[in-house]
Amino acid sequence: MKKINWWNSIFTNKDFKELSKAYFNKNISQGAVTYKFEKLISKFLDIKYTIAVSNGSSALLMSLICLGINKNHEVIIPNRSWIAPANACNILGAKVVIADTQEDLPILNVEKIINKITKKTKAIIPVHLNGRSSDMLLLKKIAKKNDIYIIEDAAQAFGSKNKFGFLGTQSDLGCFSLSVAKIISSGQGGFIVTNTKKYADKLRLIRTHGVAQVENIEKWKNIGFNFRITDLQSALAIQQLYKFNKNKKHLLKIYKIYRDEISNPNFIHIPVDTNSGEIPVYNEFLVKNRKKAIKILLQNNIITRPFYPDILSADYLFKNNKRNYKVSKFSKYGLYLPSGTNQSIANVMKCVSIINSI
């Protein structure tokens, strides 16, 4: 029996044709196709500047470098996140300060960051997990009052909105991912968006070892590294962008089925505010006996994925700081059910049927 993967992306013959076109036109490294992709993203998100980069993690690291974050600074991030924001801070020597998440949603509880702010606090990174918006209005008020930068981690939130517009466009810098399990994907890749020209100019230098171009370099003037994306990846990303509305519609359909059809009381749905424009890329549940559920589903050829650990579980980040750490319910019970831009409705209905029979 064919296995149902936890994620299934859609790649078509048209994607392959565009990749082939870029290849035969010798658009291999970063070039014209990438610049076209950047313009398309800026138009889509209604933002002035887009800088395409190697991946979403690089986007976060570059953003911190751009804003001058260093070992003398502290950066506030939520306990529930992929590890990338914390690792990016750690690489630069900045102290990671963990803020609580909301009680019933795995996103930053903005009201609880006030007592985390010190004279060393330089930035806050709200993480818009699974397309969910943090309270950006309150966060911006707090940041402005305390002269703190905001970097939105919108890796899982491309196309998601709140009442103020697209997530990732409501701060100093917004970081996005194009990895496989996203609403649009180029395999790997990412981008940074901003409305501030000086940040865009600096990010373009950081992307290529601190230089604007690699020919006729007279002097090394700025810090940077190789954070470039390729035209091959950008060609694929452009075609994926054209599928955005179709992908969004499909993901919303899957979300509605899981939300409405699962009746097992041991599977507690974690909601996404689709009425406000949030897009649920994944389908998340709190499962009382997660190990048992994973085992039963796997016996039925259904692959699920447990939530990743809390950031507070990363001992290497806090080795010099005492902390009282209690595992969150999201880390302990969270489970991703099969989804994806190419996940069939038949697969989803099978998952529902098995879950309701447990």
Model feature map: region roles:
Residues 1-27, 32, 338:
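N-terminal "arm"/small-domain region of PLP-dependent enzymes with the aminotransferase-like
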Residues 27-74, 88-92, 98-100:
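Phosphate-binding glycine-rich loop
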Residues 34-39, 47-51, 111, 123-127, ...:
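PLP-dependent aminotransferase class I/II
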Residues 71, 77, 98, 150-152, ...:
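Hydrophobic residues in well-ordered beta-strands that form the structural core
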Residues 80-86:
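Conserved coil-to-alpha-helix start sites within the AMP-binding
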Residues 92, 145-146, 300:
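Helix C-cap/helix->beta junction micro-motif
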Residues 95-105, 305:
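Short beta-strand->loop structural element characteristic of the AMP-binding/adenylate-forming
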Residues 104-186, 191-193, 197-198:
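Active-site phosphate-binding strand-loop segment of PLP-dependent enzymes
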